[in-house]
């Protein structure tokens, strides 16, 4: 009987060790479903070719007089040059264009649907002069473009559905001042006052709602953001300034708030336990989802890094562990399907991306390629990245994620206006002279 009892105890202990070290991860991986990946809409197995084509003239910018520079998308090869590619809303892209005329340089807001290359509205003329406007989305319906001469600013508010100017005139917003500085926050425009707070912006580029605080906006995810307020954070909607409190007891404070696409994590300091903080995850309504440990942050929808132990762990928003890895916490991450790519290098010139399959727990072949800010997207196996140095003769490179080998590249003229962007699920190329746009699709 004693021997039998000992065998049972040993089996239970062994089972507990197995569950804590391996079994719980296997169980969690079997239940976990990766969030949808925003794949490119066309195969990238071969070098893509032009699909639809359009020109600055087709977008509505009038032709220049003979002997004058042709109108073009207003890209610049200067380090602090014009931001010609303004923003995207789903498959819609918005660009700043320029044309020359007797009165000087005219600036234009243009838009296209990247699915078919159709013009969203005839180009909207903004200011005339050498000073380029800076444009900001302000929700799904409006674009606000600003010109700041150093002493005052003028605004143009454009209805993105009708393509009409609904307001033009003075605005308290500024581009270069610490007071009421215009700042992009997701798909909205806000005005920030350093150490004072954040304002919303209305249909006449006027100030609307106000939230006092540090003047630094954290996030956002969708239209939800956070702002520091003297040892704590306040959470609010960028659409209307509505504030809400996450699902925590009174007296709780927040620190190190970090957003992903469907929620946020925060270091939570419960009243009376300020020296024993814990990181928890929340959805975008402030509802608590799970506990991550003493240190953690989001990496993708519903996916977090827990860095509280000697190893780092990939966990779900509920705190279920999918993977444990020895070594330094990731310098960057990218989720493609069920594979998490982890940059193990802190040298931007020498990236080292190690893939982990979160369904099997297996390590893949590491790649010394750029999957950070220059990454444009993938069809599932081929990753495409932009080449952003205007002086070189390439505009894009593509790599096989299975072998890490480059499979194709796209040439351009050095020091030209050629660029490549992603709009929705489509890669869009600007011609070397800046006058034409085309989609990039798989060859027939």
Spans of features found by a protein language model:
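N-terminal "mature head" segments of proteins
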Residues: 2-140, 167, 209, 415, ...
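A short beta-strand motif characteristic of beta-propeller blades
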Residues: 54, 65-79, 118-125, 164-174, ...
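Repeated scaffold domains used in trafficking and secretory/extracellular systems
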Residues: 76-90, 125-140, 170-187, 211-224, ...
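Recurrent small/Gly-Pro-centered beta-turn motifs in extracellular repeat architectures
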Residues: 90-99, 144-149, 191-194, 228-229, ...
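Structural motif
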Residues: 102-110, 150-157, 195-201, 230-237, ...
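Non-cytosolic head/periplasmic domains of membrane-anchored proteins
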Residues: 106-191
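Loop/turn-rich, solvent-exposed surfaces of beta-rich toroidal or solenoidal domains
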Residues: 327-401
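Blade-level signature of beta-propeller repeat domains, shared across WD40, Kelch, NHL, RCC1
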Residues: 404-444
């Amino acid at each position: 009987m004693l021997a039998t009892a000992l065998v049972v105890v040993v089996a239970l202990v062994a089972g507990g060790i197995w569950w804590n070290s391996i079994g719980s991860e296997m169980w969690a991986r079997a239940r976990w479903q990766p969030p949808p990946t925003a794949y490119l809409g066309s195969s990238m197995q071969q070098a893509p070719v032009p699909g639809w084509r359009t020109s600055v003239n087709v977008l509505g910018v009038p032709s220049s007089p003979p002997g004058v520079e042709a109108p073009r998308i207003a890209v610049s090869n200067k380090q602090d040059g014009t931001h010609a590619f303004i923003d995207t809303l789903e498959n819609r892209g918005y660009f700043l264009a320029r044309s020359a005329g007797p009165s000087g340089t005219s600036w234009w807001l243009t838009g296209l649907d990247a699915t078919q290359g159709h013009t969203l509205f005839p180009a909207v003329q903004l200011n005339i002069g050498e000073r380029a406007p800076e444009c900001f989305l302000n929700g799904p319906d409006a674009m606000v473009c600003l010109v700041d001469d150093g002493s005052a600013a003028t605004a143009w508010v454009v209805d993105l559905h009708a393509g009409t100017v609904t307001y033009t005139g003075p605005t308290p917003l500024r581009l270069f001042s610490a007071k009421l500085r215009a700042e992009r926050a997701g798909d909205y425009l806000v005005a920030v006052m350093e150490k004072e707070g954040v304002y919303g912006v209305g249909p006449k580029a006027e100030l609307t709602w106000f939230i006092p605080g540090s003047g630094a906006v954290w996030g956002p995810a969708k239209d939800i953001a956070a702002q520091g307020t003297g040892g704590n954070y306040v959470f609010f909607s960028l659409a209307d300034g509505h504030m809400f409190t996450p699902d925590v007891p009174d007296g709780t404070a927040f620190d190190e708030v970090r957003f992903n696409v469907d929620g946020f994590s925060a270091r939570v300091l419960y009243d009376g336990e300020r020296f024993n903080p814990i990181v928890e995850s929340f959805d975008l309504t402030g509802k608590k989802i799970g506990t991550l440990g003493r240190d953690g942050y989001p990496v993708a929808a519903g996916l977090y890094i827990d860095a509280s132990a000697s190893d780092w762990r990939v966990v779900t928003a509920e705190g279920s562990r999918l993977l444990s890895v020895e070594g330094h916490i990731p310098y960057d991450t990218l989720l493609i399907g069920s594979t998490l790519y982890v940059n193990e290098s802190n040298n931007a010139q020498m990236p080292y991306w190690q893939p982990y399959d979160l369904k099997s727990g297996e390590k893949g072949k590491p790649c010394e390629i750029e999957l950070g800010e220059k990454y444009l997207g993938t069809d599932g196996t081929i990753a495409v990245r932009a080449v952003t140095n205007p002086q070189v003769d390439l505009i894009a490179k593509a790599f096989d994620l299975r072998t890490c080998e480059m499979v194709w590249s796209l040439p351009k003229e050095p020091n030209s206006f050629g660029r490549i962007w992603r709009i929705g699920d489509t890669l869009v190329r600007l011609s070397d002279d800046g006058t034409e746009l085309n989609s990039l699709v798989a060859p027939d």
